[in-house]
Amino acid sequence: YCAFFKNVLRYRKERGVKMSTQKKDQYRETVPHKSHFVPVSVHTTKIEIPTETDGVAALPEKNFPALYLHWHPELEFFYVEEGEVEFFIENHAFLLKEGDGIFVPPKLMHWARTKGTVLFHAAVADPLWLISPHNSECFQKYMYPVCSGSWKYAVTFTSEKNWHKEILTQLKFIFSMDEEKIAAKELLIQGTFLMIWQKLYDHHLKSFYPDAKKRSHPKVAAGSL
């Protein structure tokens, strides 16, 4: 517990000056994000904070670590099923309540804390698996900017907007998959991620992409495919 917040304080202090690549590498997550051969992992975590109603002495109200400070080259979707957390991406804080989610772009430092019991899920995927760089036009348009490691691409999801709700529904489907199911249904999982990505692009990412408005999409004549 103490070591966790010491790392956070050290990180915040180091953010005052430009962090060297060597220092940032200290926080790189070493856990491989794979389900057999598929570069996707799904995680479910429940953190229980005792209260007086549990028949034990309540812990003093303060922040407890929910997600340790780290970063990874993969993109991540995080969802709170029960409770609430304060989620940090770099130096930016987001309050996630029950039923909320957040998109974490690749290469960004992130962590979370909570004041009470919380149940959350995370889906981590290799962006190069979602859209291959060999498909250069598609990759440059939809994925490459996000891989630059900028916090501005982060976005929270709530039940207040329809496109948010659609993404949350698709994320819940992904969270229902264990390692065996992911390996057996790779195309279905990839397709679900891509549907999420299309909505994310249309409603959020597109506004940050400098050449998105310049692109034109010629119509394909029926029967020409």
Question: How would you name each of these model-derived features?
Answer:
Residues 64, 98-99, 107, 126-128:
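Tight coil/turn sites that cap or link beta-strands
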Residues 153-164, 178-225:
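Short, Lys/Arg-enriched, Trp-marked, Pro/Gly-tolerant hinge/linker segments that flank
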Residues 1-97, 101, 140-141, 151:
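Generic protein-terminus/edge-of-domain signal
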Residues 58-59, 65-72, 113-115, 133-135, ...:
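Short histidine-centered beta-strand/loop micro-motifs
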Residues 85, 107-109:
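Short beta->alpha connector loops
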Residues 20-52, 109-175, 206:
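A hydrophobic/aromatic-rich effector-binding and dimerization subdomain
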